[in-house]
């Protein structure tokens, strides 16, 4: 039961000391980089679908059937989805009927979209991969989902995740463990592992995830897809089950930068149901996605790119470091001006993040008491009902983070933990502001290693937490960031993907998308297809 657990021993390691990446946490990949020059640049699934529908080459129903068939073939191995919608073919048929009538189609018409299970979908299970919400079916759509549907998008199903977004491997799901399409013995990352793996396995065209400390970007790196975390406030959080409200954002996955960018455009904008959503204008991101034929010899001439020094120091796998350096060289060849930048407070970000996120989660998850929210376990006394409902409803990782947060917020430790963590957050924001005043974007690895084995770090939470060191600072600063594949390292049947993280100034996703699209379309080997799909139509 939750009330009988003691504060975890790891709390003694949480004071805001500088965090060094341990060399022992990196074991997935070797230093050799694999040549992928035989692979051609990727094509946008959204644009291809639209062209096929408008030309009459295919129908929305035929497209939907092909994706549902692929789900049936690959899902027993991957376990990306917790629920597949029964309305996919019906929704596709409605799009075909609109085409037959000559009606105008929305930009996402016929696009099959996976939705992370902590994002509410009307009438469909939305459990946050937790037993405490096992049978919950929301009576409303999250704003992001509502916008997708209004533009013709089809929700294909709800994707697996770490319970309430608390984890980096998707092993903390209460229902199943998702496998990485590149190597079924490895994790897809987390907490949005199901959304990333589903896009990588072409079970859906694009998907929604949530990113509190890297939960879109790290699995994008592990699965070889594009993961886009918008600026805090760019996308409404209405209908997103809260983990850490000052950090949570809804993000996008796609097999290309264009797909992720067009999905972001669809869900962005002010929402009166979310007071933290911004009234900033949403640019026409689609203008960035030109054909490769239009690129000049140096299409990024003069773009200033800062390489974050601290992200390439000891503790980063040598293969990841090499892939990042090669990606930087490619940017330079495209005309970028490279400089090395330092974020002095970088190493403080990880402990500060876990104090803040755990503190906010202990407050947010207090609503799940078996009375107001969540499955109820009957007991003779009210306190016992709370204890039993939460004790049986929450998994171990969630309980540990609730305890960490409650401990950090307690009267005797508030100043030592939570207050200091917020002070560090201010320093991190200042570091990024200074770096981005001198550079258009910053780059770093997305994670210290490629995907590791399922179960490898399950019993060592500190090692797992350390893997978030590349991503958490961006959430603390509220900035946009995108991860896209930049190479393969040895491991698995045909190599393991690693991602390059690009970080931009607040509300400047447009620049990230421009640089990322040109990088992707001109990089040899940028079409990353996992071996699982070799024999799947």
Swiss-Prot record:
SUPFAM superfamilies: Amidase signature (AS) enzymes. GO terms for biological process: glutaminyl-tRNAGln biosynthesis via transamidation; mitochondrial translation. The active site is at 116 (charge relay system), 191 (charge relay system), 215 (acyl-ester intermediate). Its main location: mitochondrion. Its EC number is 6.3.5.7. InterPro entries: Amidase, Amidase_CS, Amidase_dom, AS_sf, GatA. This protein may be expected to contain an N-terminal transit peptide but none has been predicted. Belongs to the amidase family. GatA subfamily. This is Glutamyl-tRNA(Gln) amidotransferase subunit A, chloroplastic/mitochondrial. It comes from Arabidopsis thaliana (Mouse-ear cress). The gene is GATA.
């Amino acid at each position: 039961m939750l009330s009988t657990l003691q504060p975890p021993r790891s709390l003694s390691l949480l004071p805001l000391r500088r965090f060094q990446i341990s060399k022992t946490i990196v074991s997935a990949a070797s230093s050799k980089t694999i040549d992928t020059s035989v692979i051609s640049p990727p094509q946008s699934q959204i644009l291809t679908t639209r062209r096929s529908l408008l030309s009459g080459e295919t129908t929305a129903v035929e497209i939907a059937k092909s994706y549902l068939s692929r789900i049936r073939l690959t899902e027993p191995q991957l376990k990306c989805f917790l629920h597949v919608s029964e309305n996919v073919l019906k929704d596709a048929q409605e799009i075909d009927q609109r085409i037959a009538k000559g009606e105008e189609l929305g930009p996402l018409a016929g696009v099959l979209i996976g939705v992370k299970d902590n994002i509410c979908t009307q009438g469909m299970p939305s459990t946050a991969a937790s037993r405490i919400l096992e049978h919950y079916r929301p009576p409303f759509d999250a704003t992001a989902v509502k916008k997708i549907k209004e533009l013709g998008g089809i929700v294909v199903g709800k994707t697996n995740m770490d319970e309430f977004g608390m984890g980096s491997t998707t092993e903390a799901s209460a229902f199943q463990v998702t496998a990485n399409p590149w190597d079924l013995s490895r994790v897809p990352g987390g907490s949005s592992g199901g959304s990333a793996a589903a896009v990588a396995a072409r079970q859906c065209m694009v998907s929604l995830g949530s990113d509190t400390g890297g939960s879109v970007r790290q699995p994008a790196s592990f699965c070889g897809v594009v993961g886009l975390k918008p600026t805090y406030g760019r996308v409404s959080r209405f209908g997103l089950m809260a983990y850490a409200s000052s950090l949570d954002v809804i993000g996008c996955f796609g097999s290309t930068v264009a797909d992720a960018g067009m999905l972001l455009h669809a869900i962005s904008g002010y929402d009166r149901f979310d007071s933290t959503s911004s009234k900033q204008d949403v640019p026409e991101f689609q203008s960035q996605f030109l054909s490769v034929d239009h690129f000049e010899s140096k299409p990024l001439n003069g773009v200033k790119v800062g390489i974050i020094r601290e992200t390439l120091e000891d503790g980063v796998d040598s293969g990841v470091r090499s892939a990042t350096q090669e990606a930087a060289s490619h940017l330079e060849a495209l005309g970028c001006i490279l400089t090395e930048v330092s974020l002095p407070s970088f190493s403080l970000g990880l402990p500060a993040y876990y104090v803040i996120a755990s503190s906010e989660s202990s407050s947010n998850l207090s609503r799940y008491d078996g009375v107001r929210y969540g499955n109820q376990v009957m007991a003779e006394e009210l306190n016992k009902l709370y204890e039993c409902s939460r004790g049986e409803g929450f998994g171990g990782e969630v309980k540990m983070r609730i305890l960490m947060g409650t401990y950090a917020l307690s009267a005797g430790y508030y100043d030592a933990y939570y207050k200091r963590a917020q002070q560090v957050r201010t320093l991190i924001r200042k570091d990024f502001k200074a770096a981005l005043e001198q550079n258009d974007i910053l780059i770093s690895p997305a994670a210290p290693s490629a995907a590791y084995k399922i179960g490898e770090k399950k019993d060592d939470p500190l090692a797992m937490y350390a893997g978030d060191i590349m991503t958490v600072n961006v959430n603390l600063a509220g900035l946009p960031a995108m991860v896209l594949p930049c190479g393969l390292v040895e491991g698995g049947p045909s190599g393991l993907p690693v991602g390059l993280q690009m970080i931009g100034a607040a509300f400047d996703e447009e620049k990230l998308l421009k640089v990322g699209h040109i990088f992707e379309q001109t990089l040899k080997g940028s079409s990353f297809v996992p071996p699982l799909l070799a024999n799947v139509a």
